[in-house]
Each structure stands twice: as C-alpha cells, then as structure tokens.
Design a protein with these regions (language model features):
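Bacterial N-terminal signal peptides that target proteins for export
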Residues: 1-10
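Sec-dependent N-terminal signal peptides of Gram-positive bacterial secreted proteins and lipoproteins
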Residues: 11-15
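C-terminal motif of bacterial Sec signal peptides marking the signal peptidase cleavage site
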Residues: 17-20
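Beta-strand/loop edge motif enriched in small/polar residues
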Residues: 22-240
C-alpha cells in the first residue's frame, strides 16, 4: 500500500534494520527477547513485569514528564504529544492506543497559508528517542505512533543499542500484534494538484491528512531502529 511519497508506513517489518548501514557494513546487531516485554498484557491492572527494558540491576530512570508510570521501569505514552519530548533510556514505554505527535494530520486551510482549516497553527513537535529504548504497543490493539506533518521523530540508535518497537508480549516472533509506526510529511504526492496552494491526502490507517509541495521536507531520522510484529487492518485496503 506504499503509494504515498508524502509518508512512510514502517510496519509489519520483522526485525528489519532501518538506515545507518552502508552497503558494506557488516555490523551484527543482536537483540535478546525478554521473557515478557512490557508486561502490559499479562499483569492485570498492575501492568505485569517491571517493563521489557533490561536495566542491568541499576535503578531505572524515572518516567519523563508527560508520560505516566505504569509500573517500575514502564512508562505509558500520552495520546497526544504537542511539544518536544525525549524518551530517555533506562525505562521502557507503552502505547495502549494511537500516540499522535503534532497536529499536522488535520486539514489545511485552502488559502495555502500553512495553517489548519480551524485557524490553528501546525505544531512542530519533535519526539527524540535515545539509543537502547524499547517502545511497546499493547498486544491485540491498533496501538501506533503517528508523526504528523510539521513534526519529527529523531530515533538514533546504535548497533550496540538499537531502538526497538514491538508488541508487549514475550518474544519478537509474532505479526499483526499491534499497529506500527506511521510518518507523514509535506513531500509531493502524485495526487496533489499541480500548482496547487495546499495538498491534503487522506491517508490510510485512519491517520488523517498528509502531503504537500516541499521536496526537501524531512520528518526526522531513523537510525538502527527495529519495528517488529506490527500491522493492523481497519478494512480492506485501509491498514497500517
């Protein structure tokens, strides 16, 4: 369903490494699957285990401002991120539904001034994810991370400490267990009107609008990032 240049759907990719590897890079990346990743689906209201991240016996970091502590070492992301946020290492993160960064998936004003049709400005929020962070989507839900137009994801892992998105159950061998990662942008789309003042392409996965006329638009960086076990179908031809 990859027909939109204005966005990337990075889902249903079983342990695929995105970016940061040159053609002759022979670096090996090993990821040990915990016995219970996030603990969100097995521990009732208590959230199960203390999160999928291995803190090596050290006291885990506290949950960043704007997140909610589910259990020790596990922080739930909010439904909306409208300003810059950093997901620090030392704890893991849980998504129980859609997490939307920015508001650029709304319809744009038809006069082409770059504002939304309700008169509000497009937010420019940046979600930074530190190396080694694990982000879990609640198993059996459409939990997903949506980066909207005007906002960015800066996910810069390393070979020794990749950033991993997966469901919150044990292991990494499933598929279609949660939604995935959706990235919108202002890049040109083949359905945008030639010479138009604005472009709104209704995107799949019920993720709102994307598209524009900026061929140099950037929605951030993905380096040593793994997206595993994702994929959610809303209806035929409409999926993450």
């Amino acid at each position: 369903m990859m027909r939109q240049a204005a966005k990337m759907f990075l889902t249903f990719l079983m342990l695929t490494i995105l970016g940061a590897c040159s053609g002759d890079d022979s670096t090996t990346i090993n990821i040990e699957a915990p016995s219970n990743n996030g603990g969100g689906s097995d521990g009732g209201s208590g959230g199960g285990d203390s999160g999928g991240g291995d803190t090596g016996g050290e006291t885990p970091a506290t949950c960043p401002e704007g997140t909610t502590e589910v259990s020790e070492g596990l922080c739930e992301l909010p439904a909306t991120i409208s300003s810059d946020m950093t997901l620090k290492s030392g704890v893991s993160y849980l998504m129980t539904g859609r997490v939307t960064v920015g508001n650029g998936n709304g319809q744009l004003e038809t006069n082409g001034d770059g504002t939304l049709d309700d008169g509000s400005a497009v937010q420019a929020a940046t979600l930074t994810i530190e190396a080694g962070v694990e982000v879990f989507g609640e198993t059996g839900t459409f939990a997903n991370l949506l980066i909207t137009r005007g906002s960015k994801i800066m996910a810069m892992g390393t070979a020794d400490a990749p950033i991993v998105f997966s469901s919150d159950d044990a292991g990494y061998d499933g598929s279609g267990e949660w939604g995935g990662l959706i990235i919108h942008g202002y890049a040109p789309h083949n359905e945008c009107a030639v010479g138009g003042s604005y472009c709104d392409i209704d995107s799949e996965g019920e993720s709102g609008f994307a598209g524009g006329y900026d061929a140099d638009d950037s929605s951030g960086v993905l380096r040593y990032v793994v997206v595993a076990e994702g994929g959610y179908e809303f209806s035929t031809g409409n999926e993450i």
